[in-house]
């Protein structure tokens, strides 16, 4: 990797500013998911072990920038972190004018979005943040696609900037899957809209041997193949684009197994009864809500041949058990595979948890937007600035 990581930097007696991703769900002042907090522990612990002081920064939710709002305060997060790491975590509500932190201490700064100029990476704000520490550690991959004061601007002005353990692992796993994959490679791109994943589909066409589409995206492809999809969710204006992708895939020898059978219902509800039909038999008043058993077997068979698997998005409305079979079959096929597998995106992580295959996926990305932008082949500003700093 062409940037410094935490392990390349002397941290003894240094004030270490760490941008973490503690954008966690908080309900009635209580943190309801600790996954992102737990993911940051190795970086925090490493700095403490090396004799540094830890000053943590994160955003939480979408408050009006520049205004304090108690419902978006990171104070409950500081309490949970303290319980997990079994050490005191000092909470700093007002921190821009200086943070007093000694070696071995942990300070949690309040929401970076309470600072005016955070989102546009205001220079004065970035300099102020940079003045708080000797070393800046970027460990929030989920916000790496945003050039903001606490992710990008601070790195420009601090003496030393490096990647945290989580960020470094995240990029290493994604580069292993995308830049030097062990072939054959399969990618699963699911979700409701082609429009949000269009660049991803195009970028992956040049890299994979198998491209599996699911969810509303698959409906658009089924329509592109000339079948009636009834009342199903799809994007009419992108049917032509789907045809182009299918034609390009054929040219490149990429296999896109468009579903041959589906599970349909008359309405989208938890109690709707799933009826299995061939794609040619979908009625006008029916909605495609999952793939069918033949399509499940096709996908499972294809994934057996893969040495690298990239997964982003479900293949059906898996939140409802009657339409979860396709995503369950996909999950189990990935779990049983010996391939190097990388999965990312909120719905994908929810599916991994639902079908209990967390330990069977090689790497699970905690990021949403940044994960997608990486798949699109875009550069991530907060990572690029670390590369620039490493060459200075």
Swiss-Prot record:
Report which reactions are catalysed by this protein: (2R)-3-phosphoglycerate + ATP = (2R)-3-phospho-glyceroyl phosphate + ADP
Q: What does the UniProt entry say about where the protein is found?
A: Cytoplasm
User: Binding of substrate: at which residues?
Assistant: 21-23, 36, 59-62, 113, 146
Q: What is its EC number?
A: 2.7.2.3
InterPro entries associated with the record = Phosphoglycerate_kinase, Phosphoglycerate_kinase_CS, Phosphoglycerate_kinase_N, Phosphoglycerate_kinase_sf
One Pfam assignment = PGK
Keyword ATP-binding assigned to the entry: answer is yes
Residues annotated as binding ATP are 197, 319, 345-348
What does the entry give for GO biological process? gluconeogenesis; glycolytic process
- Describe, as the record does, how this protein assembles with itself and its partners: Monomer.
Give the family, as the similarity comment puts it: Belongs to the phosphoglycerate kinase family.
Q: What is this protein's name?
A: Phosphoglycerate kinase
Q: What species is this protein from?
A: Francisella philomiragia subsp. philomiragia (strain ATCC 25017 / CCUG 19701 / FSC 153 / O#319-036)
Lineage start: Bacteria, Pseudomonadati, Pseudomonadota, Gammaproteobacteria, Thiotrichales
